[in-house]
Swiss-Prot record:
Pathway: Amino-acid biosynthesis; L-tryptophan biosynthesis; L-tryptophan from chorismate: step 5/5
HAMAP family per UniProt: Trp_synth_alpha
GO molecular function ontology, one term from the record: tryptophan synthase activity
Entries under PROSITE patterns matching the protein: TRP_SYNTHASE_ALPHA
Any one cellular-component term (Gene Ontology): cytosol
Pfam family, one: Trp_syntA
Protein name: Tryptophan synthase alpha chain
EC number(s) reported in the record: 4.2.1.20
Function field: The alpha subunit is responsible for the aldol cleavage of indoleglycerol phosphate to indole and glyceraldehyde 3-phosphate.
NCBIfam families hit by this protein: trpA
Catalytic activity reported: (1S,2R)-1-C-(indol-3-yl)glycerol 3-phosphate + L-serine = D-glyceraldehyde 3-phosphate + L-tryptophan + H2O
Taxonomic source organism: Yersinia pestis bv. Antiqua (strain Angola)
UniProt record similarity statement: Belongs to the TrpA family.
């Protein structure tokens, strides 16, 4: 959890926002997945948001569903994902690592065991996409027991009660949803969400990172804009996974394009 606090402190001192890429672990293969993640970090990623492939991903659009299918085709299992995570943490001791998950994978060997594994490999946060806040108590209790930040989604239509609950129980960062629906770069995020960011800040919530439909530098700038009213950073998934998908057969070109994309998105976080 402390890694997020350190990160936001350092970025605030530099007057920068956070740029956080999302990829599926093991896509398109375990070895290439590690190369991709090393490349994202080298290109300027401030933190990582990583998925463990799941067979029925309700919140994901076709791009991220296909990434899971590629990982499954390469024989990726949750166990292999934890091995990849341990390796990332060993190489990159300071970067915050977040998991974006579905509840079935957390339940599989017991909630407590799952968070214990996360702690062992150096994961900082877990967001469970299909668990609404009202049902999150057992997950967040296990997370905190093991020093893992429970992350909550703040939807664009959140009412005051939900904002207070998220502020009270969330740690690490708050996932600010640009819009309802499934993930996908073609579905642009709708702005502005400044009133939500204001309220979250008023209630001392963990810093807001805006995600869903963030696929170009101008959107990163927009999500951070409005001075103190903007989000603390942006998460981009589908646009990155599309680069992987288009270049599966040409890994060198893939890494070149990923470097270019992340460099441009990170540059947009600097005021």
């Amino acid at each position: 959890m402390e890694r997020y606090q350190q990160l936001f402190k350092q970025l605030a001192a530099k007057k920068e926002g956070a740029f956080v890429p999302f990829v599926q672990l093991g896509d398109p293969s375990p070895a290439m997945s590690l190369n991709i993640i090393d490349t994202l970090i080298a290109a300027g990623a401030d933190a990582l948001e990583l998925g463990i492939p799941f067979s029925d991903p309700l919140a994901d659009g076709p791009t991220i569903q296909n990434a899971a299918l590629r990982a499954f085709a390469a024989g990726v299992t949750p166990g292999i994902c934890f091995e990849i995570l341990a390796e990332i943490r060993q190489k990159h001791p300071t970067i915050p690592i977040g998991l974006l998950m579905y509840a079935n994978l957390v339940f599989h060997n017991g909630i407590d065991h799952f968070y214990q594994r996360c702690a062992e490999v150096g994961v900082d946060s877990v967001l469970i996409a299909d668990v609404p806040f009202e049902e999150s108590a057992p997950f967040r209790a296990a997370a905190l027991r093991h020093g893992i930040a429970p992350i909550f989604i703040c939807p664009p239509n959140a009412d005051d009660d939900l904002l207070r609950e998220i502020a009270s129980h969330g740690r690490g960062y708050t996932y600010l949803l640009s819009r309802a629906g499934v993930t996908g770069a073609e579905n642009h995020g709708q702005l502005p969400l400044n009133h939500l960011v204001d309220k979250l800040r008023e209630y001392n919530a963990a810093p807001a990172l805006q995600g869903f439909g963030i696929s170009e530098p101008a959107q990163v700038k927009a999500s951070l804009a409005a001075g103190a009213a903007g989000a603390a950073g942006a998460i981009s998934g589908s646009a990155i996974v599309k680069i992987i998908e288009k270049n599966v057969a040409q890994p060198v070109e893939m890494l070149v394009q990923l470097t270019r994309f992340v460099t441009e998105m990170k540059a947009a976080t600097r005021s």
